[in-house]
Amino acid sequence: MNSLSIFFIVVATAAVCLLFIQGYSIYENYGNIKEFNATHAAFEYSKSIGGTPALDRRVQDVNDTISDVKQKWRCVVYPGNGFVSASIFGFQAEVGPNNTRSIRKFNTMQQCIDFTFSDVINIDIYNPCVAPNINNAECQFLKSVL
């Protein structure tokens, strides 16, 4: 064996040892890793400290360009009437006669998700927290879910 062969054997042995050490480290800390992931799962697609948005680019949705958590659209349980889509901007709205707006309600969570995150741009928004109805029940509910 020449010196070059010995050098490559030493490098390969060191690399294999490092892989075993990393594997053992993951094995020993697996419970802590799962706990960390569960704790920070809510921040998976939020803006990172470095300023680069961490986005799920596989599916385009309305929350992809938003980094403020309160501005992100979400489906929440509406008291007694199914589900609604809400954000700091208000609720997804249904436009009735005379251009009156009311909260769009869904029977199931899946219907709410399908409507909120569909490819169609939903621009009808009803915000119950604008004057003069700042203290109504709908505004209080919106503030409570944000």
Swiss-Prot record:
Gene Ontology cellular-component annotations: membrane; viral envelope; virion membrane
Compartments in which it is found: Virion membrane
Post-translational changes noted in the entry: Contains two intramolecular disulfide bonds. They are created by the viral disulfide bond formation pathway, a poxvirus-specific pathway that operates on the cytoplasmic side of the MV membranes.
Keyword set includes Membrane: yes
Virion surface topological intervals: 22-146
Record key words, sorted: Disulfide bond, Fusion of virus membrane with host membrane, Late protein, Membrane, Phosphoprotein, Signal-anchor, Transmembrane, Transmembrane helix, Viral envelope protein, Viral penetration into host cytoplasm, Virion, Virus entry into host cell
InterPro entries: Poxvirus_A28
Protein origin, superkingdom: Viruses
Ranges that cross the membrane: 1-21
The keyword Cell division is annotated on this UniProt entry: no
One Pfam family from the record: Pox_A28
Membrane topology: Single-pass type III membrane protein
GO biological process: membrane fusion involved in viral entry into host cell; symbiont entry into host cell
Stated family: Belongs to the orthopoxvirus OPG155 protein family.
Function: Envelope protein required for virus entry into host cell and for cell-cell fusion (syncytium formation).
Subunit: Part of a stable entry-fusion complex (EFC) which is at least composed of proteins OPG143, OPG147, OPG155, OPG086, OPG094, OPG107, OPG104, and OPG099. Formation of the viral membrane is necessary for the assembly of the complex. Interacts directly with protein OPG107.
Protein name (Swiss-Prot/TrEMBL): Envelope protein OPG155
Species this chain originates from: Cowpox virus (strain GRI-90 / Grishak)
Higher taxonomy: Viruses, Varidnaviria, Bamfordvirae, Nucleocytoviricota, Pokkesviricetes
Encoding gene (name): OPG155
